[in-house]
């Protein structure tokens, strides 16, 4: 019974050790660049909402 706290502490330490397969994301990584590109595309689409509704009737149905 006295080894239980030691076992729990060891499990917590093992879980907190970073593994070799984990890689930090930088601004040059493709997933992050894709994320920012998608955000810009969505913001551009939302800002063009008025123009879309003026020129295309079907577009207003989505808004």
UniProtKB/Swiss-Prot annotation:
Residues 1-21 form the signal peptide. The keyword Signal applies. Pfam families: Chi-conotoxin. Expressed by the venom duct. One of its GO terms (molecular function) is toxin activity. One of its GO terms (cellular component) is extracellular region. It is found in: Secreted. Its main location: secreted. It comes from the Eukaryota. Keywords: Cleavage on pair of basic residues, Disulfide bond, Secreted, Signal, Toxin. Contains 2 disulfide bonds that can be either 'C1-C3, C2-C4' or 'C1-C4, C2-C3', since these disulfide connectivities have been observed for conotoxins with cysteine framework V (for examples, see AC P0DQQ7 and AC P81755). Residues 22-50 form a propeptide. The keyword Lipoprotein does not apply. Belongs to the conotoxin T superfamily. The cysteine framework is V (CC-CC). This is Conotoxin Gm5.1. It comes from Conus gloriamaris (Glory-of-the-Sea cone). The lineage of its organism: Eukaryota, Metazoa, Spiralia, Lophotrochozoa, Mollusca.
């Amino acid at each position: 019974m006295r080894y239980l706290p030691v076992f729990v502490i060891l499990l917590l330490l093992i879980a907190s050790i970073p593994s070799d397969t984990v890689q930090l994301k930088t601004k040059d990584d493709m997933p992050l660049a894709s994320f920012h590109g998608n955000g810009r595309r969505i913001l551009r689409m939302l800002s063009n909402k008025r123009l879309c509704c003026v020129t295309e009737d079907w577009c207003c149905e989505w808004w």
